[in-house]
Amino acid sequence: MSQKTIKGYINLIIPAAGATPAPPIGPALGQRKVNIAAFCKDFNDATNGMEKGVPLPTVITVYDDNSFSFKVKTPPASYFLKKYAKITKGSSATKKEAMVGKVTLDACREIAKLKISDLNTKNIEAATKIICGSAASMGLEVVGN
């Protein structure tokens, strides 16, 4: 039995249990001749237990026979940081000019534990520094030890 060859990858951020044929999902899948309804059903079933509307980075692998598989990653660090800081959006200014909120180092460590599978490190301290850097870029002050 021969192995399927990969035709391409599609990277999308899709809300949990919220895949619909509307843009951006429909056009992205339609260009690669993927069954849009089947993907939406499979994705919504796979993410049904999660909180609705959570943004989920998803990598869809399209094969030469127009079949597909997908991998759902953890939500972006910015989603968790905004949730911990109780803000709706980050700062539009540069790092030190306009801080819009605070987040603790312990919160950054908790986020790092959740995100470590998607980060380019397996060291929890390095992952925490990555999350702290994301917080600073969003205009969040990291407080704590």
Curated annotation (Swiss-Prot):
It comes from Rickettsia typhi (strain ATCC VR-144 / Wilmington). GO terms for biological process: translation. Forms part of the ribosomal stalk which helps the ribosome interact with GTP-bound translation factors. Transmembrane segments: none annotated. SMART domains: RL11. One or more lysine residues are methylated. This is Large ribosomal subunit protein uL11. The keyword Transmembrane does not apply. Belongs to the universal ribosomal protein uL11 family.
